[in-house]
């Protein structure tokens, strides 16, 4: 039996890179932010997010949250406790300010884990 190719009913739509060749691979906007994000992505398995010990590639790594790598279950549990405490404190502060839970969602979006915090939790 012969191999027969049946043409598609519709032609393929051009991709973004075909429509806009000058934008392909050029993310020059905010190069410092791009470099910071790239470092965070490449280094998140090198240090424990809580105690900052070097993580060994031949040992277990315990994960939690977005890019949260930990050397032990204890460090991971401590970070989880810090996160719960931080969220509880934020909710309590919002109640005092008369904010609603909808406003709290905006706070989470505007604050990032890398921003400075008065708690003893550490972020990379």
Swiss-Prot record:
Disordered: annotated segments: 1-20, 92-124
Taxonomic classification: Eukaryota, Viridiplantae, Streptophyta, Embryophyta, Tracheophyta
Zinc finger annotations (FLZ-type) as residue ranges: 43-87
Subcellular locations according to the entry: Nucleus
Highest taxon of the lineage: Eukaryota
Subunit structure: Interacts with KIN10 and KIN11 via its FLZ-type zinc finger domain. Interacts with KINB3 via its N-terminal part.
Entry keyword rRNA processing: no
Gene Ontology MF term list: zinc ion binding
Any one of the GO BP annotations: response to starvation
InterPro entries to which the protein is assigned, alphabetical: FLZ1/2/3, Zf-FLZ_dom
Compositionally biased tracts (Low complexity): 110-124
GO cellular component: nucleus
Name this protein carries in UniProt: FCS-Like Zinc finger 16
Record's keyword terms, sorted: Metal-binding, Nucleus, Zinc, Zinc-finger
């Amino acid at each position: 039996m012969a191999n027969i190719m049946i043409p598609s009913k519709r032609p393929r739509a051009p991709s973004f890179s075909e429509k806009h060749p000058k934008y392909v691979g050029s993310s020059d906007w905010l190069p410092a932010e791009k470099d910071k994000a790239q470092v965070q992505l490449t280094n998140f398995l090198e240090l424990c997010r809580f105690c900052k010990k070097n993580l060994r590639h031949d040992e277990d790594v315990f994960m939690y949250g977005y890019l949260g790598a930990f050397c032990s279950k204890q460090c991971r549990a401590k970070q989880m406790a810090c996160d719960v405490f931080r969220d509880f404190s934020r909710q309590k502060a919002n109640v005092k300010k008369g904010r609603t839970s909808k406003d709290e969602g905006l706070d989470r979006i505007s604050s990032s884990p890398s921003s400075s915090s008065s708690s003893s939790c550490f972020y990379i």
